[in-house]
């Protein structure tokens, strides 16, 4: 310690003044680094908490800046369609909403005459929209794929009018936000009924031709990238192929193993070809010979039905003929 004091005295008064000057520097003003780190940690913790336990969904009508009448009026122009305002309002009213509102009024002790709401539900519009949509889609598929049997057409129509596809389209068109339902989020069955009620309202407002274009633009487009037998489930493709070939007076197909690879490994692959009159009509791969034969039968059926992967895409630019629309409304 004495040696350190001696060095300090030998350096002179400048060193003493320098050290004294360092102690006189005022502290830095501002947010400390420790506080910033704690604030960032708190924000990150809150974000993870919201991801882990998200808050329950809230109706759009319960949030600020909401005008239901203005939203109803803007629904048609946003889709470039013309709706009757009264029909469109009716299309969004479900029977479960009417029952729940009447039950709430009864709990408040309101008189029976005042309990009843002067509203009409969308049941009738939904039935008309469903019937027209199924008929219109059936005609679309029959015109586009004339060789496709009735069972295949029905499977495609059922797929496009099912809850999964219809609810996906309805949510992207903001139908869910305008739907008057007792529960939220809106149940899929109620949302599907509401969407077809909107189609029924469009049918009465703009006619069958505009409604068929609406169905083409929003439902047929959901077939993009879809494979036929992902939608139409076939248990015995070879048996169906034999029936189709008999209708066309073609001999029964014969299956032959054309190629194989890795047959002694864990991931083998086989290629089976189907021959009719010594001509190769289809070839399909599979992990076993039986699976490859079934895949070859599916490939042959796609060729017969005109539903191949390299088929011509759907024409959305050409307007539909009014005669077809008249046939659709007459059939529905």
From Swiss-Prot:
Q: Which residues form the DRBM domain?
A: 236-306
Q: What is its EC number?
A: 3.1.26.-
**Transmembrane regions:** none
Q: Where in the cell is it found?
A: Mitochondrion
Q: Name one GO biological process term.
A: mitochondrial translational elongation
Q: Which GO terms describe its cellular component?
A: mitochondrial inner membrane; mitochondrial large ribosomal subunit; nucleus
According to the entry, every stretch annotated as the RNase III domain falls at 86-228
The UniProt annotation puts the transit peptide over 1-30
This protein's source sits in the domain of life called Eukaryota
Record's keyword annotation contains Flavoprotein: no
Key word Mitochondrion present: yes
Return the Gene3D superfamilies for the record: 3.30.160.20, Ribonuclease III domain
Q: Which UniProt keywords apply?
A: Endonuclease, Hydrolase, Mitochondrion, Nuclease, Ribonucleoprotein, Ribosomal protein, RNA-binding, Transit peptide
Q: What InterPro entries does its record include?
A: Ribosomal_mL44_DSRM_metazoa (IPR044444), RM44_endonuclase (IPR055189), RNase_III_sf (IPR036389)
Q: Which GO terms describe its molecular function?
A: double-stranded RNA binding; ribonuclease III activity
Query: What enzyme class is recorded for this protein?
Result: hydrolase
Q: What PANTHER family has UniProt attached to this entry?
A: LARGE RIBOSOMAL SUBUNIT PROTEIN ML44, RIBONUCLEASE III
Similarity remark: Belongs to the ribonuclease III family. Mitochondrion-specific ribosomal protein mL44 subfamily.
Q: What does this protein do?
A: Component of the 39S subunit of mitochondrial ribosome. May have a function in the assembly/stability of nascent mitochondrial polypeptides exiting the ribosome.
User: Its quaternary structure?
Assistant: Component of the mitochondrial ribosome large subunit (39S) which comprises a 16S rRNA and about 50 distinct proteins.
Query: What is the official name of this protein in its record?
Result: Large ribosomal subunit protein mL44
What organism is this sequence from?
A: Bos taurus (Bovine)
| Gene, per the UniProt record | MRPL44
């Amino acid at each position: 310690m004495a040696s350190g004091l001696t060095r300090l005295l030998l350096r002179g008064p400048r060193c003493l003044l320098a050290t004294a000057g360092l102690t006189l520097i005022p502290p830095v003003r501002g947010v400390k680094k420790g506080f910033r780190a704690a604030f960032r940690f708190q924000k990150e913790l809150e974000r993870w908490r919201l991801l882990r336990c998200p808050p329950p969904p809230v109706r759009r009508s319960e949030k600020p800046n909401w005008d239901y009448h203005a939203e109803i009026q803007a629904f048609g122009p946003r889709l470039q369609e013309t709706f009757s305002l009264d029909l469109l309002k009716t299309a969004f009213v479900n029977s479960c909403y009417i029952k729940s509102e009447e039950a709430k009024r009864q709990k408040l002790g309101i008189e029976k005459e005042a309990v009843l709401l002067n509203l009409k539900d969308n049941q009738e519009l939904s039935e008309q929209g469903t019937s027209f949509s199924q008929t219109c889609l059936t005609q679309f598929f029959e015109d586009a794929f004339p060789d496709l049997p009735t069972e295949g057409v029905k499977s495609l129509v059922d797929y496009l009018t099912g809850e999964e596809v219809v609810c996906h389209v309805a949510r992207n068109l903001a139908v869910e936000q305008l739907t008057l339902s007792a529960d939220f989020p809106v149940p899929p069955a109620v949302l599907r009924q509401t969407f077809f009620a909107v189609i029924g309202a469009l049918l009465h407002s703009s006619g069958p031709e505009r409604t068929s274009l609406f169905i083409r633009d929003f439902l047929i487009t959901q077939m993009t990238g879809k494979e036929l037998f992902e939608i139409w489930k076939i248990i015995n493709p070879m048996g169906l192929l034999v029936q189709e070939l008999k209708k066309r007076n073609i001999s029964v197909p014969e299956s032959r193993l054309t190629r194989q690879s890795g047959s002694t490994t864990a991931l083998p692959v086989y290629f089976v070809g189907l021959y009719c009159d010594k001509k190769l009509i289809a070839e399909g791969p599979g992990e076993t010979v039986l699976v490859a034969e079934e895949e070859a039968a599916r490939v042959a059926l796609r060729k017969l039905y005109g539903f191949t992967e390299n088929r011509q895409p759907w024409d959305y630019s050409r307007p539909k003929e009014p005669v077809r629309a008249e046939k659709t409304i007459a059939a529905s």
